Swiss-Prot record:
Gene: PB2
Keywords carried by this UniProt record: Cap snatching, Eukaryotic host gene expression shutoff by virus, Eukaryotic host transcription shutoff by virus, Host gene expression shutoff by virus, Host mitochondrion, Host nucleus, Host-virus interaction, Inhibition of host innate immune response by virus, Inhibition of host MAVS by virus, Inhibition of host RLR pathway by virus, Inhibition of host RNA polymerase II by virus, mRNA capping, mRNA processing, Viral immunoevasion, Viral transcription, Virion
Motif (Nuclear localization signal): 736-739
Protein name: Polymerase basic protein 2
One MF annotation (Gene Ontology) recorded for this entry: RNA binding
Amino acid sequence: MERIKELRNLMSQSRTREILTKTTVDHMAIIKKYTSGRQEKNPALRMKWMMAMKYPITADKRITEMIPERNEQGQTLWSKMNDAGSDRVMVSPLAVTWWNRNGPMTSTVHYPKIYKTYFEKVERLKHGTFGPVHFRNQVKIRRRVDINPGHADLSAKEAQDVIMEVVFPNEVGARILTSESQLTITKEKKEELQDCKISPLMVAYMLERELVRKTRFLPVAGGTSSVYIEVLHLTQGTCWEQMYTPGGEVRNDDVDQSLIIAARNIVRRAAVSADPLASLLEMCHGTQIGGIRMVDILRQNPTEEQAVDICKAAMGLRISSSFSFGGFTFKRTSGSSVKREEEVLTGNLQTLKIIVHEGYEEFTMVGRRATAILRKATRRLIQLIVSGRDEQSIAEAIIVAMVFSQEDCMIKAVRGDLNFVNRANQRLNPMHQLLRHFQKDAKVLFQNWGIEPIDNVMGMIGILPDMTPSIEMSMRGVRVSKMGVDEYSSTERAVVSIDRFLRVRDQRGNVLLSPEEVSETQGTEKLTITYSSSMMWEINGPESVLVNTYQWIIRNWETVKIQWSQNPTMLYNKMEFEPFQSLVPKAIRGQYSGFVRTLFQQMRDVLGTFDTAQIIKLLPFAAAPPKLSRMQFSSLTVNVRGSGMRILVRGNSPVFNYNKATKRLTVLGKDAGTLTEDPDEGTAGVESAVLRGFLILGKEDRRYGPALSINELSNLAKGEKANVLIGQGDVVLVMKRKRDSSILTDSQTATKRIRMAIN
């Protein structure tokens, strides 16, 4: 009331009215700027002059009971005067110091849990090592990077549901927690945050940091994983860089890295199978990365890499609309073209059918180590501005751009025949043929391209055919720039289609990706990748194939057993036996198969000769196309551990060891599982099966010629005698029976007789 009276009093004086009405507009605008709205216009200044006051803080009245009026030095901590316009107390900054030193202690147990991402960052920085600072020109390009180390990969909506469920469990509103990761995180966080006193809003903010990937489009030269991005301001400036090794890894970077490795392995493997697309999907669905299903990761993870994008396309997910060629990501920034097929002649007079793009187009090209801007017309490179880490990287980019331009002088620079094939031994398409050719040797290409004098343009220099820089001359249309070309920033995703051979096309039919574009770089995954699909057994080498094949038979023994007796051909054709074939020496594969199939047929024909362990042991050998021959084997060779190792047809070996007592099978010393049913111990072995319809007369008798194979016995006439090879290389004399009636008793007596004959 007092103030209003005072103001009225002021207004009644003519000078006041004059100042307020005649002040020029610009002053008025400034007054308005600083006095309108709730938003503080100059926070730093405001803070300075507030802190210069004695009591800049207001607090609830209850504070007077919790804090003494004066501290130990006798300084006043709060004022007895009330804050104007509210019933709060005016407090000195010294009160905050007093509170921090002498105030009540609360439990700190929840802090590391809530502020987990901060605590972890401190640890990483504590254990990180900073190296020397180098002053040099920094070629930075803007890339979309993950700025938030240590997060799960939930979508914003999924994270929102989890946060609501954890922080405000009683709040109304439909929340559906569906994915495995959502449920796990919710359960874990609810347990961690029991009796937590930190404000729910703060908890919600911190949870968001932990659950959602945050990306920014930042200029980077060097590492792009999130543990490098968090120290970007410390490691690279405009003209300097500081070496840094992170003091720890975070799961999200590991997931990204392992996902790329898994996807590359899967695409490479699928490309060589009979139906690449079906195989790829089967492998993606049967693979786990760090214990999480690969398909779940693909749905959530925004990593853009050729193999990863092929897997996403196969699953019907949207991917970036840029396309890949020669390991560079191309994005058309202007122009357009129409496609037509044209036949061209190489320098070796080989005819190539290429799809020519007619029209003027501009592209950005972004690779791991070089970037470029390309302007081209129909079969003509107009301008290429490249920047890269080193000579090698710049050369790679130039080769890719020259091939992409489809210029005649490039095609004429081909020496020799083009016959590059992919992993499945299929010829590559003409554009990739040309690319592979010049990646091997680009000397002729660069020499034939032509050179031109250049103008002096800031930040740009010329490059000669031998890749040396020059300020006078350059290869036609090609310049090297100090500035990098930014990655394509948009995160928009396009609907794409994929064909059986894993070629990904946009809706206008342009090929964006194909298996040829998948990098051959091998890396070691940070997280365990578990491939359940048999196609990926060979990824970890021969031993893994061996163990996995036998594990598969044991796991599926009930169905395998039925197929073995009723429909063996179908069983032999199962894809699970495919990888095993690569372990069997090629020259003898067919003979092993014929031998084992004959053996199995005899087991089927004769009651009581079924031997589970032996069937399991020999089954993978029967999968190869059989060759019928006279050969008998007492052991079969497999190539593992760099040499041939033997699997004994009868009995155990280091490769295949079945313990009858424990019913456990070990393959190369690794546990391959337990047999649920006991092989019938009492039955005679293979010999009795082999020798039905024959009478065993005794030991080998040389007068009756060389030992015959089991197959050849069927050619004997009734009553004819012959030596026969049985079991593990033992030979006995037999006679073909004159009557068929006694065949059944043979199998029982054969065993006893063989033992006598041998011993």
